Amino acid sequence: MKPFSLLRRIATIALLMAASSAHADTFPSRPIRLIVPFGPGGITDLIARQAALGMAEKLGQPVIIENKPSAGHIVAMQTVAQATPDGYTILLGSNTGFTVAPHMYKNLPFRIDTLQPIAPINTAPTVLLARPDFPANNLTELIQYIKDNPGKLNYGSFGIGTSAHLGMEIMKSDLGLNIMHIPYRGDAQGLLALKAKEVDIAYITLFSAQARIRAGEFKALGVLQNDRLTAFPDIQTTVEVGSKNSGMPVWIAFFAPPGTPDAVMRKLESATRSASTAPAFVEFLHNNGVEPWNPSNQDLMRFIQDQLNRSGPIIQEIGLQPQ
């Protein structure tokens, strides 16, 4: 290589490094877009907006919500995966996009594992509800009741391929249960079906269920996760009754495009964790039946990989075909 050519390449690299460093020093100098794969008005959208306010206070720039709902959350994820990696476009990611979509869509237009984790935000527990007159009062009794009545019972969930559906199917496989699945479009339909006795039991998010549990309209038999709930510590988990693989809660975390500079990532992580652990934000989560979640980013990625590994076999077993 000619000396002049080598010197020019060294100078170019130095300029790029200097530009990257200068960008990190001044970041953020304009508003940040938070791409949310859910429609406006739901609990996830509200959580995003609350977190965005806390982040903006820390960063000194607005964090603007852009709602991009779509099947599998693909549109929102693609928007961020293909965005300029400068920290100004970030993603609210969830279990749907990261642990279900890879098994349900053959040719994703991006690589999920290249999205960089900023920080986790929360989990949204899913509880198994029954009417007050249902014979079982907890998971232990429910399991025995299903075994005593094989093929005679059914359960509702808030959709095919959701964490509720997959978690219950894993529980069925783990414990040898014979109970039919009836999917509904969201919690509202599931609650109506349970009340109308279309289904015997139903998995519903705690956000939608907690007021009805406290009012005695329904009783909670179990929760689909590893640990007991802060708000309802008497409710058994599916893991503690022998279904060790069924703890698949709904979760959300923030992510950045691949290649985002480390210094920018550190600023985003610091602002996000500051917002998500603020007492007012934690109180907001608890009041809405949602649990704060604050593992390290390394533990977050291990958790996502574990969920991805567990969801694949059960999706195949129940016959869901990739599109």
Curated annotation (Swiss-Prot):
Its main location: periplasm. It is found in: Periplasm. Keywords: Periplasm, Signal. This is UPF0065 protein BP0148. Pfam families: TctC. Residues 1-24 form the signal peptide. Belongs to the UPF0065 (bug) family. InterPro entries: BUG (IPR005064), Bug_dom1 (IPR042100). GO terms for cellular component: periplasmic space.
